[in-house]
Amino acid sequence: MVISPSTLLVSITLSIICLIVSILYTSKSFVAQRNFLTSGNIAFSGASLNITSDGSAVYSWTNGPFSINILKFLAFLSLINLFLFVGLEFQETNVTFSIWLSNTAANVSLSILFDHYFIVFLTVALVVTWSIMNFSLLYGEDPNKNVFLLLTIFLLNMLILTCSNSLFLLFLGWEGVGFLSFLLIKMMNH
C-alpha cells in the first residue's frame, strides 16, 4: 500500500487542528480535597495546595502549562509538516466535509483548502501563540483564568479563516476572529 505525500501532510495538518480543538476541553481548573495534618499554602507553576487548620487540603490546578506544552508539541509537529511540505513538493488539497445544498446551480459545501499559504501560516501561528501563552504564564498570574481558552479559540478561528474554501467557513472564521479579538482586548483593559 502506497500512501501519497498529500494524504500524509493533510492527515498531519488535520490532527494538529483536532488537537487544538482538544485544548478547549482541557483548559478548565481541577479542585480536589484530601486530609493533611499541617496547615499552610504551597504553590507552584499552574497549581496550588491550600491546607486548612482542620487538616483538609484543596488542590487547585489550572491547565495553563498543559495547554502550553500541547501548543509547543503542535508547533514542533507543524515545523515537521512544513519541512515535509517543502521536501515532498506538496500539491494543494481540497477537503470537502459535506454538501449542504446540491440542487442549486452552485453547490454549498463545507470545504477547506490545504495549500502552501496555509501550511506556512499554521506553523507561524502555532509558534507565535505558543510563545504568547508561555510568556503570559511566566509573566505572572492572571486574575482571569479564561485567557488560555480565549487565545486557543482565537487561534482556531484564525486557522478556519485561512484554510476555508467556502463562503460559510470564511464568514465563520472572520466573525470568530473579530469577536475573540474584542473579548481579548476587553480582558486586557480590565
From Swiss-Prot:
Membrane topology according to the record: Multi-pass membrane protein
Signal peptide start and end residues: none
Pfam families referenced in this protein's UniProt entry, alphabetically: Proton_antipo_N
Compartment(s) of residence: Mitochondrion inner membrane
Sorted UniProt keywords: Electron transport, Membrane, Mitochondrion, Mitochondrion inner membrane, NAD, Respiratory chain, Translocase, Transmembrane, Transmembrane helix, Transport, Ubiquinone
Enzyme superclass (EC): translocase
Keyword check for Electron transport: yes
Transmembrane segments: 1-21, 68-88, 94-114, 118-138, 146-166, 167-187
GO biological process, one term: ATP synthesis coupled electron transport
Enzyme Commission (EC) number: 7.1.1.2
Any one GO CC term of the record: mitochondrial inner membrane
Catalysed reaction, written as an equation: a ubiquinone + NADH + 5 H(+)(in) = a ubiquinol + NAD(+) + 4 H(+)(out)
Domain of life (superkingdom): Eukaryota
GO MF annotation list: NADH dehydrogenase (ubiquinone) activity
Major localization listed first in the record, in broad terms: mitochondrion
S-S pairs: none
Function: Core subunit of the mitochondrial membrane respiratory chain NADH dehydrogenase (Complex I) that is believed to belong to the minimal assembly required for catalysis. Complex I functions in the transfer of electrons from NADH to the respiratory chain. The immediate electron acceptor for the enzyme is believed to be ubiquinone.
Family label: Belongs to the complex I subunit 5 family.
Name of the featured protein: NADH-ubiquinone oxidoreductase chain 5
Organism: Arbacia lixula
Highest classification ranks of the organism: Eukaryota, Metazoa, Echinodermata, Eleutherozoa, Echinozoa
